Swiss-Prot record:
Protein name stated in the entry: Argininosuccinate synthase
Organism: Campylobacter jejuni subsp. jejuni serotype O:6 (strain 81116 / NCTC 11828)
Keyword Ligase: yes
Binding positions (ATP): 11-19, 38, 121
Key word NADP present: no
Compartments, record wording: Cytoplasm
Pfam families in alphabetical order: Arginosuc_syn_C, Arginosuc_synth
Binding positions (L-citrulline): 91, 96, 127, 131, 181, 190, 266, 278
Record's subunit section: Homotetramer.
Superkingdom of this protein's organism: Bacteria
Length: 406
């Protein structure tokens, strides 16, 4: 394939690894390279990526830096949270949900620039290679895919650094740069590697980049109100913001109060177990609030069906099938369930905890105090329960009469 590629679009961060990939593509494939850097809220200045690409010989017209923050939250994060999606009971899918948007945009740039190939920096051990490549092929099945980590022999840090030095790639470390493998966007930041590769070893406190330790969080709690329309967050404390602005604000509140830290061992799609630590402050608050709103606006069986389907939906996202017909079918069902998910949720934030202290919906609440009061009521005849119970016990009664023992 090396002699067949004419132009390749590289998912480029400006960091050491993707800068090495850029040079490697030029040398090994002898092709024109286009760089694409996505701003999905990782919190880093992106202009250095442009300068780095220029220094490595990339033409100005072949450098693409795109602000995708609002699209990321509106079209990916919010739809996922309508489903209350959690992978293996804990993981809020912060890395998984970002990959489809990057892959889609990268494929679009390939079409725009006439590139016949795309490339990414995901390793051959992880899930991201699957997520990126499923996304590419969903948009353009004719694209050639170059995954350097599956091809080259630069399989150690020493070899990578030696290659960088040989080709004049800057390897100076930024002051305060974390030694962990990290990935960040508006939804979360993740940490892998080093001491975390021993699941018995506790993460060090200085690893956490975003949030205060719950022990160091304010001694005073903070009460906030979140407004929802059709399952999506629209305002915080009455203030309407853009989708990215809303998640940014929730992150600030969560970080302040030590919310959203997670240390898990997860099952990767490729088959191995992997330990990761995550900070998802805003997402943790959002999930709790959304479920609280659904508790008063969703019909019981609709809510239970959603809960049954959620693990499948979460696995599809984790494994890279965002653009699959089955995910879209589930999304249509989920979105239908959110028509009445309108209202306000009041929460109290305190030292790592998110506590629901109120929920209301002016027009869509199914909670009716007249039916569930412990006081005398005029709408519910308690004698009706006897027949309901007897009918539901009928199979037990028949089995018992036939001598069955339970």
């Amino acid at each position: 394939m090396k002699n067949e590629v004419k132009k390749v679009v590289l998912a480029y961060s400006g960091g050491l690894d993707t800068s090495i990939i850029l040079k490697w593509l030029q040398d090994e494939y002898n092709c024109e390279v286009v760089t694409f850097t996505a701003d999905i809220g990782q919190g880093e200045e992106l202009e250095p990526a442009r300068k780095k690409a220029l220094s490595l010989g990339i033409k100005e017209e072949n450098i693409f830096i795109k602000d995708l923050r609002d699209e990321f939250v509106k079209d990916y994060v919010f739809p996922m949270f309508r489903a209350n999606a959690i992978y293996e009971g804990e993981y809020l899918l912060g890395t998984s949900i970002a990959r489809p948007l990057i892959a889609k945009t990268q494929a679009q740039i390939a079409l725009q620039t006439g590139a016949d190939a795309v490339s990414h920096g995901a390793t051959g051990k992880g899930n991201d290679q699957v997520r990126f490549e499923l996304g590419y092929l969903a948009f353009n099945p004719d694209l050639k895919i170059i995954a350097p980590w599956r091809e080259w022999d630069l399989n150690s840090r020493e070899k990578l650094l030696a290659y960088a030095q040989k080709h004049g790639i800057d390897i100076s470390k930024k002051k305060g740069k974390s030694p962990y493998s990290m990935d960040a966007n508006l939804l979360h930041i993740s940490y892998e590697g080093l001491v975390l590769e021993d699941p018995a070893h506790a993460p060090e406190e200085d690893m956490w980049r975003w949030s205060k330790s719950p022990k160091d969080a304010p001694n005073e709690s903070e009460i906030i109100e979140l407004d929802f329309q059709k399952g999506d967050l629209v305002a915080i404390n009455g203030e309407k913001l853009s989708p990215a602005g809303l998640l940014t604000k929730l992150n600030e509140l969560g970080c302040k109060h030590g919310i959203g830290r997670l240390d898990i061992v997860e099952n990767r799609y490729v088959g191995m177990k992997s330990r990761g630590c995550y900070e998802t402050p805003g997402g943790t608050i959002l999930l709790k609030a959304h479920r609280a709103l659904e508790s008063i606006t969703l019909d019981r069986e609709a809510a239970h069906l959603k809960d049954e389907l959620m693990p499948k939906y979460a696995s599809l996202i984790y494994n890279g099938y965002w653009f699959s017909p089955e995910r879209m079918m589930l999304q249509a069902l989920i979105d239908e369930s959110q028509i009445h998910a309108n209202g306000r949720v009041k929460l109290e934030l305190y030292k790592g905890n998110v506590m629901i202290i109120g929920r209301e919906s002016a027009n869509d609440s199914l909670f009716n105090a007249a039916y569930c009061t412990f006081e005398e009521d005029e709408v519910y005849n308690q004698k009706d329960a006897a027949g309901f119970i007897k009918l539901n016990a009928l199979r037990f009664i028949i089995a018992g009469k036939n001598g069955r023992k339970f």
